Amino acid sequence: VILYLNGVEIYRNNMPAGLVDSHTFAVTNVFGAGESTFYSIKLDTSLLAPGINFLAAEVHQAGSDSIDLSFDASLSASNVVLITRGPYLQQGSETGIVVRWRSDRGTESLVKYGASLDNLAFSVHDSALVTEHEMALSNLLPGTKYYYSVGFPGFDLGSGPDYYFVTAPATNKTTRIWALGDCGTANGDEQRVRDAYANFSSGRPTDVWLMLGDNAYSSGTDLEYQGAVFNMFPDMLRHNVLWTTIGNHETYSGIFDEFPYLHIFSPPRNAEAGGLPSGTKKYYSFNYANVHFLCLDSMTSDRSPSGAMMTWAQADLAANTNLWTIAFWHHPPYTKGSHDSDLEQELIEMRTNVLPILENYGVDLVLSGHSHCYERSYLLDGFYGYSWDMKPAYKLDAGSGRPEESGPYIKSGIGPSAHQGAVYIVAGSSGQISGGQLNHPAMFVSLNELGSLVLDVNGTSLQATFLRDNGLVRDHFTILKGITQRLRISEFNIEDELVFIAWTSKPGVTYRIQSSSSTTGNVWSDYTGNITATGNETSWYDFFDDLDPDRLFRVVVIQ
């Protein structure tokens, strides 16, 4: 059977997918108990029109030799209202947040909230009858956990211990950021990436959650968003604000300003979460702790330096005083994955028009997707040409950025500092991988592997981790700010039972001694606690009764 309401298909059972006609057979025979089995479906009331509605059914035999045919149906109304999407959170700031949800029929909107699950003492209410509910909570306390419920007067449609959010902190704190690029496949690949992060971050809450575009394949329809985002992350959406950007696939199901993305999400247009007002959902900025986030639209907005988007971005960056600046958009300025930044207009224009502005205002990290791979650059500045134009001078640090190898990337400035280098990451493998040459000269590492990006910001330290879908860490690096010189071992001495290490240091910077009993040096553990430097050279020593000749020592920068 196939059911239609007002000419729109609403249900299909035991019929093949795709177009059918009077000659299409049912998939299997129905016999015995199956002949009296009823199926219950829930009808979306938004499909009902005022006045007369038409419910039609077409019933198909399983073969041309069948001689009996029966069908029965009933339609009944219920007073039960159900949430069909969400709730989900938008516009999180120190003092406010937006709670959204969708109901299967029009109701008033009510959010109750408070500091404990048993005392939701505050509320916001809107008497308009709507199915798309969007309620702004204000006058909240920074860095505070609130529980909430959603519904309408007299009815709670959703509440419980996992209905909560934490407002952004007023002061600096350790911040965990999770970024997903091109994740919207709604398949096992996306699920494995999701689950790997859940295991990796178990016990460590996510503070900022980013999606880098192509969030719902293949056309960014409302139904595809339901499967790839809302059904994929229902728990996380209830207590984490989701910050998104527009990918090319977001635009395939609508015209310039009417694709579903713009109706599903409510990013800050009027500086509700910091930064300057953009006046549009397509690009915006926000602050969290000591990080300023800049979201640009690389798909539908004017990418020229004098266009509305970059005029706003320059003013926004000029007003930014945060310690860190992270920009994100969909089309990467450098890639040789499933897309090529030497060939595609959006990628070329973001590199040639946008990067000079961002680097002039001291951007630290740029995240994008589009290429279904993972690529991570060196610490770069001033590279705005094609891949064959790469010169050594554009690499401010040609090392790995790993403390245990060539050392972290260092930037002497505190806060936005022009042309001290940025790292560019393509993290477009959160839902699929598509290969490519993976040989762009700007990149230190290029991987055709599924995964997501985890960032941990702690004061003047930013640590990045590429986490595979199988839980393995396949890349990591660190950026340190306020550092004018690299850590150099100035003396290392083993004499009898004494180990002595001295190194160049900067007053106020924290170090640790780590040791390894592995001759390959691939398993390290902290041997000391924090050692805070008070001068330009710091030393440490210890005595050992029986020193292992294969033991290794190293000095690492903590922050």
Protein language model annotation of sequence segments:
Residues 16, 25-80:
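An acidic-aromatic loop/edge-strand motif
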Residues 145-169, 222-325, 340-353, 379-428, ...:
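Extended active-site neighborhood of metal-dependent phosphoesterases/phosphodiesterases
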Residues 178-181, 208-214, 241-248, 297, ...:
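Active-site neighborhood of phospho(di)ester-bond hydrolases with catalytic His/Asp-centered motifs
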Residues 484-559:
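Short, composition-biased motifs enriched in small/polar/acidic residues
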Residues 47-49, 137-145, 544-549:
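Surface-exposed, short loops/turns at beta-strand junctions within beta-sandwich domains
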Residues 1-7, 55:
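Aromatic-lined ligand-binding clefts that engage carbohydrates, nucleic acids, or primary amines
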